[in-house]
Amino acid sequence: MTRHFLVDTDLNPQEQTEVLDLALQLKRNPYLRQPFAGVGAGRKTVAVIFDKTSTRTRVSFAAGISELGGTPLIIGAGESQLGHKESIADTAKVLERMVATIVWRTFAQVGLEEMAANSKVPVINALSDDYHPCQLLADLLTIKEHKGGLKGLTMTYLGDGANNMANSYLLAGVTAGMHVRIAAPAEYQPDESVVRDALNRADETGGSVLVTTDPRLAASGADVLATDTWVSMGQEDEKASRAEIFKPYALDAAALALAAADAVVLHCLPAYRGYEIAAEVIDGPQSVVWDEAENRLHAQKALMAWLVERS
């Protein structure tokens, strides 16, 4: 059966551990696994489709596919018939006959679901409006490197709780058995359905979920502090108003002082210093942001290898 990765919970706890452990191995030995190379490996091309602009996602997938022995085929916005002159379902049926895997950075989660439903090759969510599961694999890999493990750690996210990063922190974090806290204004908290899914997964793993409007409560004693931009793509006209709303949720020195003394700081980038995160924090000694950015490469390589070898 073809395996896809559309949302963080598409990997169960054991599978998530397998992918992260493989990522650590690939970080030490980049060419350890090459599922797209060699005799009998099948197709070598991976379609990487971008409906949204990207730096880290584009570079990490392109480099990772090459290191896995494959060839990345980058398809930018407006460079195909996808979604306007040809249906998603028909596009999937064509691509599956030509490529080994489909990676898609897009807007609507439902589009990814339709692509996967009509594809016999793995489909990977490289970001949607609802989830950013590849980023969370990189984040968990980074935490595991610096903390030695994941289970039982407290991970706090401050800021816009209604965005894709908050959703993925909830789902990926509890899958790893972590205690996940989201601090956000009342009108910007995660959707109830996502919280419900996270609670269900937490019941399996011993993790927990706290959603609050109190950033001090959320930051207190945390092992990991994370944030994301307050102004996502398409929200540029709201920059001033959103900056005022989210100001109490900034990841600054005061927030960091409330966390555990050895807490690490995450930000998926791009970062806006002086807004969601202080320069002294992102550029300070507790920041692991640059390891986090690099780990997109290793985590996604592990994910692609894991999916292809099981599909």
Swiss-Prot record:
Enzyme class, broadest EC rank: transferase
Biological or metabolic pathway of the protein: Amino-acid biosynthesis; L-arginine biosynthesis; L-arginine from L-ornithine and carbamoyl phosphate: step 1/3
Matches recorded under Pfam families: OTCace, OTCace_N
Binding site for carbamoyl phosphate: S54, T55, R56, T57, Q81, R105, H132, P133, C134, Q135, C268, L269, R296
Gene Ontology terms: cellular component: cytoplasm
Keywords: Amino-acid biosynthesis, Arginine biosynthesis, Cytoplasm, Transferase
Domain of life: Bacteria
Binding site for L-ornithine: N164, D228, S232, M233
Catalysis performed (reactions): carbamoyl phosphate + L-ornithine = L-citrulline + phosphate + H(+)
EC number(s) stated in the UniProt entry for this protein: 2.1.3.3
GO biological process: arginine biosynthetic process via ornithine; citrulline biosynthetic process; L-arginine biosynthetic process
Subcellular location field: Cytoplasm
GO molecular function: amino acid binding; ornithine carbamoyltransferase activity
InterPro entries: Asp/Orn_carbamoyltranf_P-bd, Asp/Orn_carbamoylTrfase, Asp/Orn_carbamoylTrfase_sf, Asp_carbamoyltransf_Asp/Orn-bd, Orn/put_carbamltrans, OTCase_ArgI
NCBIfam families named in the record: orni_carb_tr (TIGR00658), PRK00779.1 (NF001986)
Family of this protein: Belongs to the aspartate/ornithine carbamoyltransferase superfamily. OTCase family.
Annotated function: Reversibly catalyzes the transfer of the carbamoyl group from carbamoyl phosphate (CP) to the N(epsilon) atom of ornithine (ORN) to produce L-citrulline.
Name of the protein in its database record: Ornithine carbamoyltransferase
Organism: Renibacterium salmoninarum (strain ATCC 33209 / DSM 20767 / JCM 11484 / NBRC 15589 / NCIMB 2235)
